[in-house]
């Protein structure tokens, strides 16, 4: 029997990526891992999910894109090499289509139960020739931890020949081997995996292979059947396995199996082995988390190198959640022939509730360490840029100020600051976006010191009592000074579908605070957004300025209401986990604002792991979508936000199949303008005066916005579907694919020219003021690295 088996563990925030291909020609006894791999063409695929047994229970939620010619055929029951003998006699149709030159959209999406004996799969996969030898099988067992994503691809040796014919198939199974009871232990993990299988041509209608499932639960499996045309001629296939853990640093054990029959895969599941390489034709190249983030050798010997520091948000990580962003930054830098080193700090994982100061100081100390401060090798880089998501934007603001003050300005004189970028960062906190009882809950420490910072709670400090976000925005502080040193300051803000950090606070637009519901029904940005690079004047925005006072009244008034609506929201949230809530006929996948006649709506989706999935209708698409909120419900705006936030988190809306073929045509950037600081002061003066008439409810937010607007900012407003907050950084490559265009837009901004040669002028600063803040603000005994 040809077998490849591997068992391993992966850690919090890591990604393991695998690239596999099958050696072609001859009887394949002497296949080597050094064989070159040609481009992938004409790929087809089928995804199969299992349910029923604890050994092979299918993961909930998923997606398949497959394409090819004449692929709607049924496997004969006699072909035992491709259909397990123990399967029952019922059949599930393959969702597939024939292609022609005049057709528009040919791929379908589907999921399959394991209670089948005959499955419609591509014609190329039928009739695997009967031989006396056992079918080839490759199996990899591994364990994923909260920081890891694994892709299983490694070389192997064996003496058994590979069955090489046009009727051959390749089965791939990824199984979450954690105990079933851990499905309920969400706050201890969660112990779920995100699995993706794709090829180089996944975006081509006629040559696509793309299968993914963002929620492979413990004791469930994710199956993909790859026809011969997909792996012939040594065409590569990629497998990526990512941990979905958020709250705890937990290991998740998984198994990867590759074979020509499902029966062989199941037989190997019981084997008590860690690693077995007995599949000579199968070549596996494994990129470990360390390899993915390994520094280029050239960076140690270059005088001009650009360091890009990535900072994650709350309950997030750099290694897995920002891997896609890192990959695209490096790719884009090659177009301008610039040596870019992308790094991220991992020391704040699972500790993001400890406050901006605590997190920022640790990040600052790490930054000094990797740049060689205090050693003969300083500076190790010539330029530096910082890119952060969500809470990370505030953390990196503190970190650059900390570095600036501790080195008395020498750091940024030696390493030139270029780009300061934030993505969905709560610059104005979150108190102005929600009723006051939400702010009070945060101020009481419901999410630790970070919640107090975001609710603009006054500091308990012997010298400074202003809220910390107000303090950081003060022009006399090293934080403000350090941010001002950067050549370009860019912020990205979601106009819709971001209930965690809405547009008002992420764009530093006071007049937009608390207007999430209004933005949901409009394609336009809030009225204070700049047009043609110039902020509107007070006269032009009289109605907008008035809305600030009205908005303050509404937010303040909502705090007087009873908490009944919030309680109902929580009850609704609990209902999301019931079977009845998961099986709804009135569901809808959010589509990008583009008309597409080929985009279909799912029918009867079952997202939460039902034992049987209805796939009898070949036109069905299987998506994991969220139940729609009843528009007549009595929920308040904040209650709806709570439900929507958790719905997006637990049941993420994945892109439609047609999106992957036409994603480059979808426009998500609503506006992209440069803010002129000189044109905004009259507007802020009017807003301040009006706010004073309403008991100064938004006085802190106005102060923060006014201070930061002393600097020039490039503001990019985007409109994303699904979970916009995490989609903005493409937390997972395919489930969050709506954010691809945002990342592309960001990389085009950062690398429109070679920054190493474009920005060389030294900075200037007030050293006396900077040094004075060092001991007063962040050499606090309560802060330890």
Swiss-Prot record:
Bias type Polar residues, positions: 63-86
Keyword Ribonucleoprotein on entry: no
Biased composition (Low complexity): 32-41, 89-99, 127-140
GO biological process: lipid catabolic process; lipid metabolic process
Region named Disordered: 29-99, 115-140
GO cellular component term of the entry, any: lipid droplet
Source organism superkingdom: Eukaryota
Active site per the UniProt annotation: 390
GO molecular function, one term: monoacylglycerol lipase activity
Keyword Lipid metabolism recorded: yes
Enzyme Commission code: 3.1.-.-
Keywords: Hydrolase, Lipid degradation, Lipid metabolism
Composition-biased stretches (Basic and acidic residues): 47-58
Protein family membership: Belongs to the putative lipase ROG1 family.
PANTHER family referenced in this protein's UniProt entry, alphabetically: LIPASE ROG1-RELATED, LIPASE ROG1-RELATED-RELATED
UniProt-recorded name of the protein: Putative lipase C4A8.10
């Amino acid at each position: 029997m040809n077998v490849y088996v591997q068992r391993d563990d992966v850690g919090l925030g890591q990604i393991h990526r695998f690239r596999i291909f099958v050696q072609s020609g001859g009887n394949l006894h002497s296949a080597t891992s050094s064989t070159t791999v040609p481009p992938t063409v004409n790929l087809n695929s089928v995804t199969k999910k299992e349910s029923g047994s604890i050994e092979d229970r299918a993961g909930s939620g998923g997606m398949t894109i497959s394409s090819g010619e004449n692929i709607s055929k049924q496997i004969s029951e006699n072909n035992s090499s491709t259909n397990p003998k123990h399967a029952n006699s019922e059949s599930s149709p393959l969702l597939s289509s024939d292609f022609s030159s005049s057709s528009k959209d040919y791929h379908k999406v589907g999921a399959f139960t394991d209670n089948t004996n005959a499955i419609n799969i591509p014609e190329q996969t039928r009739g695997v020739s009967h031989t006396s030898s056992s079918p080839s099988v490759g199996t990899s067992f591994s364990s994923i931890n909260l920081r890891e994503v694994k892709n299983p691809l490694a070389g192997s040796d064996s003496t058994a020949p590979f069955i090489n014919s046009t009727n051959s198939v390749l089965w791939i199974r990824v199984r979450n081997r954690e105990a079933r009871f851990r499905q309920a232990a969400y706050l201890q993990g969660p112990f779920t995996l995100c699995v993706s299988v794709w090829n180089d041509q996944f975006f081509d209608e006629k040559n696509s292979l793309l299968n993914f499932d963002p929620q492979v639960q413990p004791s469930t499996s994710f199956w993909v059947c790859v026809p011969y045309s997909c792996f012939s001629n040594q065409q590569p296939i990629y497998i990526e396995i990512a941990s979905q853990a958020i709250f705890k640093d937990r290991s998740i054990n998984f198994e990867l199996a590759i074979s020509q029959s499902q029966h062989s895969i199941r037989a190997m599941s019981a084997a008590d082995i860690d690693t077995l390489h007995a599949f000579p034709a199968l070549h596996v190249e494994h990129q470990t988390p360390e390899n993915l983030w390994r520094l280029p050798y050239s960076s140690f010997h270059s005088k001009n190198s650009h360091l890009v520091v990535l900072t994650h948000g709350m309950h997030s990580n750099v290694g897995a959640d920002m891997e896609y962003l890192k990959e695209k930054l490096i790719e884009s830098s090659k177009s301008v022939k610039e040596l870019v080193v992308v790094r991220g700090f991992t020391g704040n994982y699972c500790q993001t509730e400890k406050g901006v100061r605590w997190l920022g100081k640790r990040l600052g100390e790490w930054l000094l360490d990797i740049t060689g401060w205090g050693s003969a090798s300083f500076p190790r880089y010539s330029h530096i840029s910082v890119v952060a998501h969500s809470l990370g934007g505030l953390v990196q603001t503190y970190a650059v100020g900390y570095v600036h003050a501790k080195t008395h300005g020498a750091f940024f004189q030696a390493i030139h600051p270029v780009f300061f970028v934030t993505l969905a960062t709560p610059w104005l906190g979150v108190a102005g976006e929600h009723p006051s009882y939400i702010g009070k809950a945060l101020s009481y420490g419901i999410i630790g010191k970070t919640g107090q910072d975001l609710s603009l709670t006054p500091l308990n400090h012997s010298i400074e009592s202003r809220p910390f976000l107000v303090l950081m925005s003060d022009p006399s502080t090293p934080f403000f000074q350090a941010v001002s040193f950067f050549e370009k300051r860019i912020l990205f803000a979601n106009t819709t579908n971001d209930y965690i950090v809405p547009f008002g606070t992420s764009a530093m637009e006071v007049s937009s605070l608390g207007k999430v519901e209004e933005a949901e029904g409009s394609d336009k940005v809030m009225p204070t957004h700049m047009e043609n690079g110039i902020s509107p004047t007070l006269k032009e925005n009289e109605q907008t300025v008035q809305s600030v006072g009205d908005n303050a009244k509404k937010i303040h008034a909502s705090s007087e209401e009873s908490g009944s609506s919030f309680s109902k929201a929580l009850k609704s949230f609990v209902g999301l986990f019931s079977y009845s809530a998961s099986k709804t006929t009135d569901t809808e996948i959010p589509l990008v604002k583009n008309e597409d006649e080929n985009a279909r709506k799912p029918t009867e989706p079952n997202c939460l792991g039902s034992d049987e999935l209805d796939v009898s209708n070949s036109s069905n698409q299987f998506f994991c979508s969220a139940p729609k909120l009843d528009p007549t419900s009595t929920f308040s705006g904040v209650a709806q936000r709570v439900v929507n936030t958790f719905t997006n988190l637990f049941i993420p809306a994945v892109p439609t199949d047609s999106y992957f073929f036409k994603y480059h045509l979808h426009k998500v950037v609503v506006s992209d303008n440069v803010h002129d600081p000189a044109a905004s002061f009259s507007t802020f003066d009017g807003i301040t005066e009006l706010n004073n008439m309403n008991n100064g409810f938004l006085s802190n937010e106005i102060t923060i916005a006014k201070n930061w607007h002393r600097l020039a900012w490039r503001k990019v407003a985007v409109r994303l579907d699904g979970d916009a907050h995490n989609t903005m950084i493409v937390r997972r490559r395919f489930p969050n694919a709506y954010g691809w265009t945002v990342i592309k837009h960001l990389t085009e901004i950062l690398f429109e020219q070679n920054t190493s040669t474009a920005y060389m002028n030294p900075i200037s600063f007030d050293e006396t003021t900077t040094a004075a803040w060092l001991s007063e603000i962040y050499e606090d005994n309560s802060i330890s690295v």
